[in-house]
Amino acid sequence: MKSLRAKFLSLGMALVLALSASGCAITTPAVVGSIGGVEIPAGIYLLAQYNAYSSAASAADLATGETADDVKAVLNAQCTGTIGDEEVTTDGADYVARLTLRSLQHYAAVETLFDELGGTLSDAATSEAADQAESVWSSSGDLYAANGIGKDSLEAYLLNAAKATELLQLFYGENGQTPVTDEEYIDYLENECLYLDMVQLPLFDSSTYAFADEEQSQTIESLAEECAATLNEWATAEQGRSERFTSLYEAAMEYVPRAGEALGATMESAQALNYAGTQLMTPDDLVTYGDALTDAVAENGRNVWFTYNMGTAIGVLCAVDPLDAADLDSYKQSDLLTTMKQDELDQTLYEEGAALEQNLDESAMQVYKAANIKRTV
C-alpha cells in the first residue's frame, strides 16, 4: 500500500497535469471591479490599501513592543481617528477597508468629473507625474513590487492627482463652473488670513541644538520688546512697503545677533537677514497656533509691532493689510485658490464618488486582502 504522503504527491501531480491539459492557469485578478464607469485596476486598489494601512498604523493602539510593521497586530488593534466627518473607533482591518474605499471613491470621482468637464493635462503635468513615479520607484520600488504595486500604477495614481489639481481650476478658476470672484478673494484675505511682517529672535542655538535656559530666555524677551519699540518708533517715518522692508532688515541685523550672543553663539549681521521676512498666514497656517496668535493680533491691531513667543523664537510681529502688502493679482497667481477651495473640492469629490454605482468585486478584494501587506523587503 502506498504511504499517505505518496498518495498526496500523486494527487497533487494529477491536479497539475489536469490543469496543464485543459490550458487552465491560476491567476490573480487584474481589476477589482468598478466605481461608476471607472475601472479600478488591482495596482490602484493595492496602492490605496497600502496608504490606508499606513494611516491605520498611526491610529492604532498597539501593545508595548508592537510596531507599524506588525501587520497582524495593526489589523487587530483598535484604531481611533477621523474618516471624513465621522469620528471612528474600530479594528484596524475595518479602518483600512473604510479608508481604502474612500480613497477609491475619490479616485473614481476625479476620473469621472475630469472627463465630464473636458479636462486635459498639459505635457508638463504628464511628464511630472512620470518623473515623480520614477523617483519614487528608484527609492521604494522593491517595497511596492513586494506589495503587487507596479510603477505604472504609481504613475496612474499621480496622474489622477494631477487631474484633481486641474479640477480646482475647472470648478473655481477664472473660466471655471463657479469662479471665485474678486470680492471672495478679498473677503478671504481680510477675514480669514493674516499678513505678518516679522523679525524672529531665536531661542534655539542651531549649532549646539540647545534651547535657551530661563535667564537666556528673559534676556531675549527683553531684546524683543526693545526691537518692537524701535520698529514702532521707526514706523512713524515710513512712507510705504520699501521703507518698511528697510526697517525690518535693519532691526534684524541689530537684534538677531544680540539674541545669538545671549545664547552663546556668534552670528554675522548678514546671517540675521534669514530671521526677517513677511508671510501670508492662511487658516491652515494659523491652526497650529490655536487662537493665541489671532488673539494677539486682535489685541494689538494692524501696523503695530508686538512680541509673540513662537516656541523656537520670540517673534517681533506686525500685522498689515494683505492688500497693502501685495496686489490682488499677485495673490491670484500664487496658490491662494488651493488654500481657499481645496477642502471644498475634496468634499465634493468624496460625495460624488460615494454616490456613484459601487461595483467592487468582494472576491477579488479578498485576493488582495490587507493581511498580505508587506512593510519590509
Language-model-detected regions and their locations in the chain:
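PPIase-associated folding chaperone regions across multiple families
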Residues: 26-28, 144-225, 280-377
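Bacterial N-terminal signal peptides that target proteins for export
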Residues: 2-11
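Cross-family detector of peptidyl-prolyl cis-trans isomerase
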Residues: 26-27, 36-42, 245, 249-255, ...
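C-terminal motif of bacterial Sec signal peptides marking the signal peptidase cleavage site
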Residues: 19-23
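Peptidyl-prolyl cis-trans isomerase
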Residues: 226-288
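N-terminal targeting/tethering segments
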Residues: 26-149
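Alpha-helical transmembrane segments of polytopic integral membrane proteins
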Residues: 18, 107-111, 164
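Charge-rich, solvent-exposed alpha-helical interaction surfaces
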Residues: 70, 74, 99, 223-226, ...
